[in-house]
Amino acid sequence: MRVREMQRNWQHLGKWGLLFLGILIICNANATDDLWVTVYYGVPVWKEPTTTLFCASDAKAYDPEVHNVWATYACVPTDPNPQELVLGNVTENFNMWENNMVDQMHLDIISLWDQSLKPCVKSTPLCVTLNCTDVNITMSDINGTSLKEDQGEIKNCSFNVTTELKDKKRKQQALFYRLDVEPIKNSSNIYKLISCNMSTVTQACPKVSFDPIPIHYCAPAGYAILKCNDKRFNGTGPCEKVSTVQCTHGIRPVVSTQLLLNGSLAQEDIIIRSKNITDNTKNIIVQFNRSVIIDCRRPNNNTRKGIRIGPGQTFFATGEIIGDIRKAYCNINRTLWNETLKNVSGEFKKHFNFSVAFNSSSGGDVEITTHSFNCRGEFFYYNTSGLFNETEVANNTNENITLPCRIRQFVNMWQRIGRAMYAPPIEGEIQCTSNITGLLLTRDGSKDIDGKEILRPIGGDMRDNWRSELYKYKVVRIEPVGVAPTKAKRRVVQRAKRAVGMGAVLFGFLGAAGSTMGAAAITLTAQARQLLSGIVQQQSNLLKAIEAQQHLLQLTVWGIKQLQARILAVERYLKDQQLLGIWGCSGKLICTTNVRWNSSWSNKSYDDIWDNMTWMQWEKEIDNYTKTIYSLIEDAQNQQERNEQELLALDKWDSLWSWFSITNWLWYIKIFIMIVGGLIGLRIVFAVLSVVNRVRQGYSPLSLQTLIPNPRGPDRPGGIEEEGGEPDRDRSMRLVSGFLPLTWDDLRSLCSFSYRHLRDLLLIAARTVDRGVKGGWEALKYLWNLTQHWGRELKNSAISLFDTIAIAVAEGTDRIIEVLQRAGRAVLHIPRRIRQGAERFLL
């Protein structure tokens, strides 16, 4: 009976166990739909920063030209294998008018000019009275008067200067251009240098020349330069053809006004760029699709003489002009120039729907009203009215447009107000050929008699010159750490066993920028390898450039910039690694966390995120919540580390081999003694209890090992001789001798005792649970029946209420109808009553 009862109980218990197991499985299945924050390292994500760029060039250390000298110390060697990686399915916004690269280049070229003039002589001591006369020009006209120098354009001046001895004076003679001197008190012969009213005038070194070389701007490691390859890109707005480069193309920092020289050309049609074409205060940058050659010459064969103006100072001036004195001039092919202007006008008509007319500059400083540039160390200023005056251009039929030039030796510094530079005369004839690749224009805001918008050349702000080359670039900061929701949850905090190797190139890193998040996550290893090796490669080049400056015993401004770029790259990498370490993700490309994803951060579905979005789109989606997510990951990691510390404090079973350590033997001996002592004590307790039990029954113990039969009942005869009977299971007791058998017997008795009581306890618990479940089920059934009963009662009550209301309404309606009928009948019977009354009255 007991066995059957146990079977029935276990059957019920098994049913309920299966029920609970099914519920648990369902709950776990639902739990798998939860999303958890996962950290990814090496994702193709970038943001727009402000950072320090460095330059690269093929400068020649032996060349005294100022750009070569500057680039030798300021720039690293160019990459012989420049790489460019096209980013498919990427659209990026560019803005050439708000580009930090332009400001950096502007400061760099200012630094170049300042550094080039640092070791040269200040000409302030030459601010003396000049007694000047006009140089006699006897040259006959050539082809009219185009090449004949104007009378009075060159002055022959004499003046007194201080010799090596400060108390001694010496009279000197030199030639100056009319633009470099000004009369004193309207005198016809007494002059002074035009620069004497300026604070500082620095003379360029006599062996220095200005011939710009291509300079490449490069991004430090951890940053990238994005390039727009759209051939019709106007410099502002989204660009769909984006690539990434390490450095820009070679940019020649040509300082010029009105015309852009030796720049890059548009690949298809002429491109017109302006911050706001309808605003006449905004300059217009025109980029040609075909260059126009301009050939400039100074035919005068000048000589140079040195004038001592004090101890250790020499002022270089023009001594004499050998041969004919002729004007400096520039030649431009008339047909090609007219065709270019016609195409520019057509572009304005095509894209902005208005016709334009060109005219000469409206006035201002000579640097703005003329096209100024540096040719082999001489500063040329030539009048461009012959280029932009349509009437003059149309009436002239010569093959070339010849523009007369004027030369200045005292030049206002374009980089800052109140400073000037004296350019020493260059000996011999000078010739330089350049390519006109663009224009700087401005709108008058008014129209001519034909209703055309008037465009005039302009210049002065060299940032526009740099914008014409940097319009298609922007610098971005790579953000390799990204977070996204996944279905994987971190279960335990595991210590990283090894670090993941980092190394590759920037282009592999951003190669998956246009891919979906799911596709990009597969290539994380290749992307992450870039970060460290890219840093090492760039820092090696920077270090070589810095080492080249060690003999100077001090770093230049650019040397400091190189150090900044080097340190910045390492700091960026270490910052990312520190962040991963705080999150417990060191050395991992994909790191799960136990932070539950909050749908308020993004309500997009899991499939929509991983199958349809790029990492850039996803980063913009959660940008406002990034700090919150980072904080939650850090808090969760701190909690896990505390849990791990507590767990490790209790964990003494790190390795099975530690069990055999000699340091644990003492513990083993203690445990063995405790077990043996416990068994002996247990044996003593059972023996004492047995003796006490038998003494109470009237027996005296002869020995602890003597078999003492248990008393038999009167209904069970003893099994002696032939008498039968069922032997009692407690009738005999096994006699054991020895320590180990005795120990084993006691241990077996203890286990049997424990098993019986635990079995009874489990049966009691099972019965209790079964009864409780049955009682709960009966209670639920009772509640369900009670609910159904009261539901039926409520339904019947409601129906009865509705019936009563309907009857009352019907009866009331009948009464109202009856009253109305009676009233109607009374009204209808009025004539009858009148007639009956009349009849009675007449009768």
Swiss-Prot record:
Residues 382-405 are annotated as: V4. Residues 34-671 are extracellular. Keywords: AIDS, Apoptosis, Clathrin-mediated endocytosis of virus by host, Cleavage on pair of basic residues, Coiled coil, Disulfide bond, Fusion of virus membrane with host endosomal membrane, Fusion of virus membrane with host membrane, Glycoprotein, Host cell membrane, Host endosome, Host membrane, Host-virus interaction, Lipoprotein, Membrane, Palmitate, Signal, Transmembrane, Transmembrane helix, Viral attachment to host cell, Viral envelope protein, Viral immunoevasion, Viral penetration into host cytoplasm, Virion, Virus endocytosis by host, Virus entry into host cell. GO terms for biological process: clathrin-dependent endocytosis of virus by host cell; fusion of virus membrane with host endosome membrane; fusion of virus membrane with host plasma membrane; positive regulation of plasma membrane raft polarization; positive regulation of receptor clustering; viral protein processing; virion attachment to host cell. A motif (YXXL motif) lies at residues 699-702. SUPFAM superfamilies: gp120 core (SSF56502), Virus ectodomain (SSF58069). Residues 361-371 are annotated as: CD4-binding loop. Glycans are attached at residues 30, 89, 131, 136, 143, 156, 160, 186, 197, 234, 262, 276, 289, 301, 333, 338, 343, 353, 359, 383, 389, 395, 400, 435, 598, 603, 612, 624. Residues 561-579 are annotated as: Immunosuppression. CDD domains: HIV-1-like_HR1-HR2. Residues 157-196 are annotated as: V2. Residues 649-670 are annotated as: MPER. Residues 709-731 are annotated as: Disordered. Residues 1-33 form the signal peptide. Residues 132-156 are annotated as: V1. A motif (Di-leucine internalization motif) lies at residues 842-843. Residues 499-519 are annotated as: Fusion peptide. Residues 448-458, 450-458 are annotated as: V5. Some of the most genetically diverse regions of the viral genome are present in Env. They are called variable regions 1 through 5 (V1 through V5). Coreceptor usage of gp120 is determined mainly by the primary structure of the third variable region (V3) in the outer domain of gp120. The sequence of V3 determines which coreceptor, CCR5 and/or CXCR4 (corresponding to R5/macrophage, X4/T cell and R5X4/T cell and macrophage tropism), is used to trigger the fusion potential of the Env complex, and hence which cells the virus can infect. Binding to CCR5 involves a region adjacent in addition to V3. The membrane proximal external region (MPER) present in gp41 is a tryptophan-rich region recognized by the antibodies 2F5, Z13, and 4E10. MPER seems to play a role in fusion. This is Envelope glycoprotein gp160. It comes from Human immunodeficiency virus type 1 group M subtype F2 (isolate MP255) (HIV-1).
